């Protein structure tokens, strides 16, 4: 459980009560005493996913998903980063023989065992599962019940036998993100009944397979790994029925959807996005942990990362990860970062975004400080003014600010009034004196605990878009970004109504419908956007992080698109 720190030795009882209420909004629900399995799950923290390798949809782990072949050195380097557990997703579909035996290729099963052993040798807790099989064929269970169940049972019979003598630091997850809609049903109760049948069958197969499997930790997922209350309650009922002390519940979490993909104007880590974390994990805690069932978040991240990690602005993304990590820690829930190759390079063993990893790593031991923004904008050709930001100190104390190793002077270069940090106009003028559009300097802010927070000082001018023509499959607006960065785009028909996909909002999904190409000097409008745009005129509003808004008009006629600058 996360402990709050205070610089005061004595606090009034009223303040103590208020703090406890803030930390435990559902504290009225008394928690069950910690179990051995709860201690096991807490020892797994932090965890990492070896995504898009053995779970590749295809016959070769290196071909279908583009990642290099797993090496022992990779596993050792993950352990060296401080991770205590690893989830190794495995897709079996292309490696299973025909009915009735559904024999798994010996070479593939041995390969899985090899990777598992490397992880165990690195002193990691290890989770293996049945991964993309969930949507490849298990999802057809309603229409192909007997075949799916026989195949599923055969897989787990062979896995259980292969690993029955492995130590208890190896756990089995029954199925990843189980779903059954390909069978024809969308009925929640029917889907839950099929999942319950799979989970119970999995449980019985493993428990009756001998060796260490009689007590091996088993991980059971909600329907689609979703943390909705209905689905968690259903899983709780299944686990209660099984009455086994070595069970772990799992859900996945990718944040409040509009923020996670950058749609509907949710460009910032705001109160609604934060409250989504609070509500979700209060419910997870009260459904499972408080009743003696430990929980691991088997995957977490942001959905926009599937496109690229720049879909969410850097500072906003850091605030999400910081708050998420500390809140689930309060709830005694362990987490496993989803990494399909976008975070930790599997040959150089370097993080693609060291600042993101530093924020995640700092969360393992405490809280980090953040700010209302990580961007300080100075408009070219205008009088520079003092600029203030709000610090989210999170119980910490600011210790220094520096640029390129030179410490800034309090009172001269900046002032700090409680948690309000003000950068003086004289310092901002100095930092942007070269007149280069874009990031001119990075102010590194250090605190007594946690990760550093970096402010990028940006010199910008109003972005300029130019008229152009193109097609629905290839349309790019020539853009002079002038040091600014794009936050979002609105699309509205001139005659009224929202244009493009998700027409319940005028703000379109970043990268899916539009994409800034800074190095090319373009804003690309994607085919997916035009697929749902009528043949008429659309007004676009491009909103930038400086606060600038630039209007643009497009006219679609069949596959032809004409763009006109305002």
UniProtKB/Swiss-Prot annotation:
Keywords: Carbohydrate metabolism, Cellulose degradation, Glycosidase, Hydrolase, Polysaccharide degradation, Signal. GO terms for biological process: cellulose catabolic process. GO terms for molecular function: beta-glucosidase activity; cellulase activity. It is an enzyme of class 3 (hydrolase). Its EC number is 3.2.1.4. It catalyses: Endohydrolysis of (1->4)-beta-D-glucosidic linkages in cellulose, lichenin and cereal beta-D-glucans. One of its GO terms (cellular component) is extracellular region. Residues 1-30 form the signal peptide. The active site is at residues 177, 299. Belongs to the glycosyl hydrolase 5 (cellulase A) family. This is Endoglucanase B. The gene is celB.
């Amino acid at each position: 459980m996360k402990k709050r720190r205070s610089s005061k030795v004595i606090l009034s009882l009223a303040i103590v009560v208020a703090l406890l209420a803030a930390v435990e909004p559902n504290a009225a629900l008394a928690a069950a005493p910690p179990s051995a399995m709860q201690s096991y799950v807490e020892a797994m923290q932090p965890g990492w996913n070896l995504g898009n390798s053995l779970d590749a949809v295809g016959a070769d782990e290196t071909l279908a998903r583009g990642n290099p072949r797993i090496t022992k050195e990779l596993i050792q380097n993950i352990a060296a980063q401080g991770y205590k557990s690893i989830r190794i997703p495995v897709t079996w579909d292309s490696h299973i023989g025909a009915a009735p035996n559904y024999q798994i290729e010996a070479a593939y099963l041995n390969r899985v065992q090899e990777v598992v052993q490397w992880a165990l040798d690195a002193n990691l807790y290890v989770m293996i599962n049945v991964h993309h099989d969930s949507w490849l064929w298990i999802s057809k269970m309603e229409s192909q019940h007997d075949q799916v169940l026989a195949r599923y049972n055969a897989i787990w019979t062979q896995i259980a036998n292969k690993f029955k003598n492995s130590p208890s630091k190896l756990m089995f997850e029954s199925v990843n993100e189980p779903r059954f809609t390909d069978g024809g049903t969308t009925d929640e109760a029917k889907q839950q009944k099929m999942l319950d049948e799979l989970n119970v069958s999995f449980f019985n197969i493993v428990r009756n397979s001998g060796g260490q499997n009689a007590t091996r930790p088993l991980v059971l997922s909600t329907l689609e790994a979703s943390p909705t209350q209905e689905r968690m309650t259903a899983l709780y009922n299944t686990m209660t029925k099984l009455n086994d002390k070595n069970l772990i519940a799992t859900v996945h979490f990718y944040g409040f959807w509009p923020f996670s993909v950058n749609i509907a104007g949710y460009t910032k880590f705001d109160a609604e996005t934060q409250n989504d974390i609070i509500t979700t994990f209060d419910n997870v805690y009260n459904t499972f942990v408080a009743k003696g069932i430990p929980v691991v978040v088997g995957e977490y991240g942001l959905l926009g990362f599937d496109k690229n990690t720049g879909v969410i602005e850097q500072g906003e993304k850091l605030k999400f990860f910081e708050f998420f990590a500390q809140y689930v820690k309060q709830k005694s829930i362990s987490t496993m970062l989803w990494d399909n190759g976008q975070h930790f390079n599997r040959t150089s063993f370097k993080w693609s975004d060291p600042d993101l990893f530093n924020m995640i790593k700092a969360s393992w031991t405490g809280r980090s400080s953040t700010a209302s923004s990580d961007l300080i904008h100075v408009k070219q050709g205008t009088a520079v003014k003092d600029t203030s930001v709000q610090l989210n100190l999170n119980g910490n104390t600011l210790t220094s600010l520096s640029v390129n190793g030179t410490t800034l002077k309090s009172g001269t270069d900046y002032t700090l009034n409680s948690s309000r940090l003000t950068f003086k106009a004289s310092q901002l003028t100095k930092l942007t004196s070269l007149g280069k559009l874009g990031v001119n300097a990075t102010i590194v802010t250090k605190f007594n605990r946690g990760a550093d927070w970096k402010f990028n000082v940006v010199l910008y001018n109003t972005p300029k878009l130019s008229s152009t023509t193109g097609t629905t499959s290839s349309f790019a607006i020539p853009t002079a970004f002038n040091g600014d960065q794009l936050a979002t785009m609105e699309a509205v028909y001139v005659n009224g109504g929202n244009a493009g996909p998700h027409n319940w909002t005028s703000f379109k999904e970043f990268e899916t419908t539009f994409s800034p190409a800074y190095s090319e000097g373009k804003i690309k409008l994607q085919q997916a956007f035009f697929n749902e745009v009528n043949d008429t005129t659309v007004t676009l509003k491009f909103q930038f992080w400086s606060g600038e808004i630039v209007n643009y008009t497009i006219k679609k006629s069949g596959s032809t698109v004409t763009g006109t600058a305002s």
